[in-house]
Amino acid sequence: TQNSWELKFYALKPFYRSLANWAIFMTNPATYGWKDNVGTMPPIKVHIHDVPLTHEQRLAAQTATGNLITVSMGGIGDRGKLSQIAKGKDGMPTNKPGYIRDLIASWPSESTLVWCKYNQEQETMESVLEGCASIHGTTPEEARYALIDDFKQQRRMQLVTKPKILGYGLNLQVATRQVFSGICDSFELYHQAVKRSNRVGSTRELNVHIPVTELETPFIDNVLRKADRVQQDTEAQESMFKEIGYDFVG
């Protein structure tokens, strides 16, 4: 492919055979007969929720794309426009914040991470989730520590932020629910955000809720398709290394 490498099917085994001389691909030691430290990790359950568009959103989408219905994501510019319309850009009426508020209210005793994409979207979620913690890119470091501690100690039951801000490294197992108010095409951002609450040592299943309008369906379909592909590739690569069976398997 243009400006990138492509691994042909017939070259898979020779490639991994060469790689296995000095490397190993591993997500679970049990694959190679070693102690399984991750087998007891609870499952991640993903729930997709359909949120109806408002009349104003539908008209705005038709104006932006020239189509009566959304049939594809289009280019980056079109995707960005549709994503902002779906989230109620510039005060446009939207059903999503109220839907998310009511959804979270249905599990009052569970801590929830709410992931946003845009600043305005995050501010809207702050306004409908009374008493929530909210961390922006401009939030001072000391304030971040205090808000995260409030969330971990369940003094605040919801934490609103963005994957680019808190999606990496943090251990937030206290959250047994996650809600993606906004989502983009990046599987890495989605995966890292989800794994903040599903880590070695977790004892409770994680429920991930993704409320989407028809404008956002292509985004989530794309991300989940990437997730399936990553899982398939992971299993195939581990199987290949195991089949090759150099000394590291012994």
Language-model features and meaning:
Residues 115, 161-162, 180-183, 211-212:
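Conserved beta-strand segments of the P-loop GTPase G domain that flank and frequently precede/overlap
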Residues 159, 178-179, 197:
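Short, well-ordered beta-strand core segments
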Residues 113-115, 123-126, 130-166:
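Conserved helicase ATPase core of P-loop NTP-dependent helicases/translocases
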Residues 1-111, 116-119, 125, 221, ...:
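Interdomain linker/hinge connecting the two RecA-like lobes of the SF2 helicase core
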Residues 59, 98, 123, 127, ...:
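Alpha-helical elements of the RecA-like P-loop NTPase motor core of helicases
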Residues 170-183, 207-209:
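A short beta-strand element within the Helicase C-terminal
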Residues 49-51, 135-137, 181, 211:
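Hydrophobic residues at beta-strand termini and immediately following loops
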Residues 185-250:
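A conserved SF2-helicase RecA2
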